[in-house]
Amino acid sequence: ANLFTSDQDLYTDSR
């Protein structure tokens, strides 16, 4: 996830 994305995206990108 990018710094501009929401925190929700951080978890989805942690795959």
Swiss-Prot record:
Ranges annotated as spanning the membrane: none
UniProt KW keywords: Calcium, Heme, Hydrogen peroxide, Iron, Metal-binding, Oxidoreductase, Peroxidase
Record-level GO BP terms: hydrogen peroxide catabolic process
GO molecular function: lactoperoxidase activity; metal ion binding
EC number: 1.11.1.7
Broad enzyme group: oxidoreductase
Annotated catalysed reactions: 2 a phenolic donor + H2O2 = 2 a phenolic radical donor + 2 H2O
Cofactor note: Binds 2 calcium ions per subunit.
Cofactor: Ca(2+); heme b
Keyword Ligase among UniProt keywords: no
Function: Removal of H(2)O(2), oxidation of toxic reductants, biosynthesis and degradation of lignin, suberization, auxin catabolism, response to environmental stresses such as wounding, pathogen attack and oxidative stress. These functions might be dependent on each isozyme/isoform in each plant tissue.
Annotated family: Belongs to the peroxidase family. Classical plant (class III) peroxidase subfamily.
Name under which the protein is recorded: Peroxidase 4
Species assigned in the record: Daucus carota (Wild carrot)
Lineage: Eukaryota, Viridiplantae, Streptophyta, Embryophyta, Tracheophyta
